[in-house]
Amino acid sequence: MAGVAQNGHQEMDFCVKVDPLNWEMAADSLKGSHLDEVKKMVAEFRKPVVKLGGETLTVAQVAAIAAKDNAKTVKVELSEGARAGVKASSDWVMDSMSKGTDSYGVTTGFGATSHRRTKNGGALQKELIRFLNAGVFGNGTESCHTLPQSGTRAAMLVRINTLLQGYSGIRFEILEAITKLLNHNVTPCLPLRGTITASGDLVPLSYIAGLLTGRPNSKAIGPNGETLNAEEAFRVAGVNSGFFELQPKEGLALVNGTAVGSGLASMVLFDANILAVFSEVLSAIFAEVMNGKPEFTDHLTHKLKHHPGQIEAAAIMEHILDGSSYVKAPQKLHETDPLQKPKQDRYALRTSPQWLGPQIEVIRSATKMIEREINSVNDNPLIDVSRNKALHGGNFQGTPIGVSMDNARLALASIGKLMFAQFSELVNDYYNNGLPSNLTAGRNPSLDYGFKGSEIAMASYCSELQFLANPVTNHVQSAEQHNQDVNSLGLISARKTAEAVDILKLMSSTYLVALCQAIDLRHLEENLRNAVKNTVSQVAKRTLTMGANGELHPSRFCEKDLLRVVDREYVFRYADDACSANYPLMQKLRQVLVDHALENGENEKNANSSIFQKILAFEGELKAVLPKEVESARISLENGNPAIANRIKECRSYPLYRFVREELGAELLTGEKVRSPGEECDKVFTAMCNGQIIDSLLECLKEWNGAPLPIC
């Protein structure tokens, strides 16, 4: 543990031999389930205070401070215990200057021109900020060339955390000023582009320094969205000390770090972890509405593969499906009629744990890498007060950001690819086990094309997401007179990953709306089948039981086979015109009677015992009553009085359905209504972006004990 030396600087146990390479610490951080980690992240995100001490900052805390809706409610507090260490390093710089010590960035020029020398340390820091203000904003502070306020707030928080550790030679008062800006929701304007994240995020961070020093080109956004100059920003934030005259090393301490890249990466990974869990639950719902076979989640299968991400994904899906009546009903049908559907479900369903598992592991690993980065000291030189020296190294190299963001983005693209494959099966009546083409729910499929437009949109989203999966880090250019000849491109990669997260949210919201549509269609299917079955049974009893003279007729034995036809036939293949001779229901019902007539043999020659003679009577009465009964069943469901309740209420996935239907008011879509699919998808997308969907997602898994079902 860290202690405080007599000189006030934090004293770390760097020489302790236990875990000298930090591998054990990295491994320990991955203990426990990913879901538990996500729950912890959500809890941290919702805490009202983020306490900074330099070593315990999390991606969830960064995301909380960054979030626009949290700006007025979540506050930052600095550890008073860090003050002494920060002061010690600042005093050391001033003392070394007074002794004439030659230090990089304090008495020398920068980068490839570090051979230049000066004794005017304050002026050197001022010039550093001026020449790094090289960003381009375009038309105003809200232009597309300005870093979003959330990204800037994240960067400010991370930079404070780094500087609190006391290795950077900066005054504590400057950190307090940045904290006041955060707590009063005053956000400096930073350029979106212009950094290679080595030597740190020099250009964007220089604009925070520019605001602190009162540069005339500095701008900020106030708590109500107003544009502020530096003087106005200080007044609104309650920074009464006036603009800072930077001491030697303070400008370098502010700009020479990876905070913009790692701050944005933290925001991205908070969302990515939630999206990973979301994809597991959506895959389970997909299995429900597709009447999938649940054995693909059996623990033995996944235990034999050994990968923890896969094992957890399967266990989560198993938990959802174990409590699902959607799975139990088709299971009975598959047992009695194994040819009703293929022996195995297609890959998008059956191998979803194997597909999602590695992506979860990648996202989780990236999260840990970024959490190490936001708790690191990542500038140069580092002030080692205990050994009375400045260390010249390269912690500003943001490679952990670039690499983790490239990897996370590839994982997000893979999740999106699975969603698109599942969505494509869901809307295709050749694959979806009886759901209507395009998930149309209207009475006339010729005037209702359901989710056809949404499938096209999903293809577009998926294509863009796959393009974004291409790595950023292999596009490095040698910079700054070949001094920065390798650089991480961390912020660029984080920006592209933020785009990927946004697109995956578009896909997830569209997919969830489609799944809710499928759930309601299964409900409609069950009620329509029930109405058809009851009607066929009643008509059969009336027309097939008795002969013309009141005797029992041999056609009475047809009823069981007629009802079997209704059970087996996909409802939506005939629902728009149940008695059409062109649709399979009437054809197969007639075939049952024909088959029985053929078996009736010589009895067919007798008009009183002929089954053929009964066909016209049966079909005639069925045509007279069945359309009315089908329409009546549909109307009853639309009015909220269905004969059979919606199975989803008995399922563990119900909280997500309830959220979409009741909390957001997104309704069943039909061609008969004015509302479009995009309007409903927009509701879910907005809710996802605002974090409103998280509680419903976690409620689906509240009973999961963190382990798969036992192998019996």
Swiss-Prot record:
One of its GO terms (cellular component) is cytoplasm. Pfam families: Lyase_aromatic (PF00221). Keywords: Cytoplasm, Lyase, Phenylalanine catabolism, Phenylpropanoid metabolism. Its main location: cytoplasm. Induction: Strongly induced during the hypersensitive reaction to TMV or to a fungal elicitor. The keyword Lyase applies. GO terms for molecular function: ammonia-lyase activity; phenylalanine ammonia-lyase activity. CDD domains: PAL-HAL. The modification 2,3-didehydroalanine (Ser) is found at S199. GO terms for biological process: cinnamic acid biosynthetic process; L-phenylalanine catabolic process. Pathway: Phenylpropanoid metabolism; trans-cinnamate biosynthesis; trans-cinnamate from L-phenylalanine: step 1/1. It is found in: Cytoplasm. It comes from the Eukaryota. It is an enzyme of class 4 (lyase). Gene3D superfamilies: Fumarase/aspartase (Central domain), Fumarase/aspartase (N-terminal domain), Phenylalanine ammonia-lyase 1, domain 3. Contains an active site 4-methylidene-imidazol-5-one (MIO), which is formed autocatalytically by cyclization and dehydration of residues Ala-Ser-Gly. It catalyses: L-phenylalanine = (E)-cinnamate + NH4(+). The active site is at Y104 (proton donor/acceptor). PROSITE patterns: PAL_HISTIDASE. Its EC number is 4.3.1.24. Homotetramer. This is a key enzyme of plant metabolism catalyzing the first reaction in the biosynthesis from L-phenylalanine of a wide variety of natural products based on the phenylpropane skeleton. PANTHER family: HISTIDINE AMMONIA-LYASE (PTHR10362). Belongs to the PAL/histidase family. This is Phenylalanine ammonia-lyase. It comes from Nicotiana tabacum (Common tobacco).
